[in-house]
């Protein structure tokens, strides 16, 4: 019995929900707003649910860009995998949909802060990002056991170019994970947003060089739609 209790304690203490137990609280109001939309909006069971960060939330032309699909937007600005783990069930379980698409791009940003006169890196490691991706997947599978789940690659941007190597490695880890698991798919985008000079193409972004402009979204939609067409039977 003691051994069993120890195993249970060890499992709970190692859970991402415990490790990042404080990260979700600041987003509670945003999640409640999204839940309110679930009560007001109606969709068919052929819809595709999009969850993630501001690139989802700000995608005003999503219905036009994904014309043959029925998108549901449930993104909130600044989302990280370390906070979306707290809300995955609430964002996903109410929806009977054809597929789920995820774009979360804020766990590796290059931001630092000073603590006791020392500079501290606030980013997660690529391997930690992968752990959270796996956790999110398990949460989704509790209510949607076999549904296709698409992970959209984090886009290369000038704003975060200094940490692109880390972002790229995290992308590679997630892609490799999807290839080994049934009904998980990875949407590669990086090559479309890199210019001939090997740098991010700023013509596809707004002034902050982080978020997509209309042209960037149109391209994003084309890439995503092609992946849906390939992997989802209409």
Question: Where in the sequence are the language-model features?
Answer:
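N-terminal secretory targeting modules
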Residues: 1-50, 64, 231-234
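Structural recognition of the beta-strand scaffold that forms the well-ordered cores
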Residues: 48-51, 72-75, 99-104, 148-153, ...
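Catalytic His-Asp segment of secreted/periplasmic serine-dependent ester chemistry enzymes
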Residues: 155-234
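Active-site segments of SGNH/GDSL-like serine hydrolases
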Residues: 104-109, 138-169, 190-191
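Generic structural signal for well-ordered alpha-helices
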Residues: 88, 133-138, 171
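Oxyanion-hole/transition-state-stabilizing segment in secreted/luminal serine hydrolases
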Residues: 56-65, 70, 83-130, 155-158
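Second-shell loop/turn segments in exported
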Residues: 73-77, 120-126, 159-164, 206-210
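Catalytic nucleophile-elbow at a beta strand-turn-alpha helix junction centered on a G-D-S/GDSL motif
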Residues: 46-61, 79
């Amino acid at each position: 019995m003691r051994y069993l209790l120890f195993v249970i304690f060890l499992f709970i203490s190692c859970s991402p929900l415990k490790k990042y137990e404080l990260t979700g609280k600041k987003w509670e109001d945003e999640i409640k707003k999204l839940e309110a939309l679930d009560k007001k909006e109606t969709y068919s069971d052929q819809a595709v649910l999009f969850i993630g960060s501001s690139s989802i939330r700000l995608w005003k032309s999503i219905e036009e860009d994904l014309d043959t699909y029925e998108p549901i937007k449930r993104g909130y600005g600044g989302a990280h995998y370390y906070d979306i783990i707290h809300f995955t069930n609430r964002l996903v379980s109410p929806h009977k949909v054809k597929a789920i698409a995820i774009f979360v791009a804020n766990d590796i940003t290059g931001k630092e802060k000073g603590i006791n006169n020392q500079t501290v890196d606030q980013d997660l490691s690529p391997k930690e990002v992968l752990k959270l991706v796996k956790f999110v997947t398990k949460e989704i599978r509790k209510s949607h056991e076999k549904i296709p789940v698409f992970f959209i690659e984090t886009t290369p941007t000038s704003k975060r170019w200094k940490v692109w190597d880390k972002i790229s490695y995290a992308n590679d880890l997630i892609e490799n994970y999807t290839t080994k698991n049934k009904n998980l798919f990875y949407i590669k985008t990086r090559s479309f947003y890199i210019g001939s000079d090997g740098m991010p193409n700023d013509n596809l972004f707004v002034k902050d060089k982080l978020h997509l402009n209309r042209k960037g979204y149109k391209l994003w939609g084309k890439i995503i739609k092609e992946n849906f067409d390939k992997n989802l039977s209409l």
